[in-house]
């Protein structure tokens, strides 16, 4: 059974622009997959469709999460909120509530599986708090649990979002440009944490990235989008400069500045020892712009709780 299965998915925006066109994609449980493409290629749109934040075109299509249909033929499943419990969504914009403590922000992940009266009262059990403490320790920010989220750096806020996904007990993490606004050191830590969660918890990870070097280092498989279509789906080791130019033409050098030819993710998948990260990762490029406008804080909080 696939963790994510998509068949014939298309998405047209109200202005008539095609966001996605005939997407077919299957991701197995425990895979770590990079989603790459220029701004506007459909990366964010695809991730939001998988989470069913909006419906696809009304035509034969389907999105299944662990064998259950979350969206079919342009209609979102009635029990979509229940199904979203399996999905932890990490936004590019840090979607924490600034005035709340880091611990409380992480505990929001537990809201989807607690009784309604506890949701309304905002009461969390000792077990929930113990799980939050464990998750914060796992992502390396346990000492900030009682601080306001506003005091965290960008990289720490993204790690708090990952801790929230652990408290949510998500089986899939969808990360939409999680390092686009971070400095190189913070970017590396967030990606290392995603890889650790993938390895230690066998979480399925689909992460959209703007830097090809990062995709090659951390993800054994790459899915490339161009103008809403999948133009490559295969091992990161096969994604050479020549292949990139064939896929993206003269635009290949703009969003995809490949450093050297080191591809640790591909080597590790083949059982070979990893090497040092590409130099280009140490000097990551400028932040990407999201495919769509970020949601308001209230909408992001509602989405993050997956209630």
Curated annotation (Swiss-Prot):
How does this chain sit within the bilayer?
Peripheral membrane protein
Among CDD domains, the record links this protein to: ABC_PhnC_transporter
InterPro entries for the chain = AAA+_ATPase (IPR003593), ABC_transporter-like_ATP-bd (IPR003439), ABC_transporter-like_CS (IPR017871), ABC_transpr_PhnC (IPR012693), MetN_ABC_transporter-like (IPR050086), P-loop_NTPase (IPR027417)
- The ABC transporter domain is annotated at 4-252
Catalysed reaction(s)? phosphonate(out) + ATP + H2O = phosphonate(in) + ADP + phosphate + H(+)
Composition bias of kind Basic and acidic residues appears in 265-275
Which Pfam family, any one, appears in the UniProt record?
Answer: ABC_tran
GO CC field: plasma membrane
Q: What class of enzyme is it?
A: translocase
Q: What is its EC number?
A: 7.3.2.2
Instruction: Map out region (Disordered) in residue numbers.
Output: 265-307
GO MF entry, a single one: ATP binding
Q: Where in the cell is it found?
A: Cell inner membrane
Q: Which UniProt keywords apply?
A: ATP-binding, Cell inner membrane, Cell membrane, Membrane, Nucleotide-binding, Phosphonate transport, Translocase, Transport
Q: Does the keyword Phosphoprotein apply?
A: no
Annotated residues that bind ATP are located at: 37-44
Task: Please explain the role this protein plays, according to its UniProt record.
Answer: Part of the ABC transporter complex PhnCDE involved in phosphonates import. Responsible for energy coupling to the transport system.
Family membership noted in the UniProt record = Belongs to the ABC transporter superfamily. Phosphonates importer (TC 3.A.1.9.1) family.
Quote the subunit structure annotation: The complex is composed of two ATP-binding proteins (PhnC), two transmembrane proteins (PhnE) and a solute-binding protein (PhnD).
Protein name in UniProt = Phosphonates import ATP-binding protein PhnC
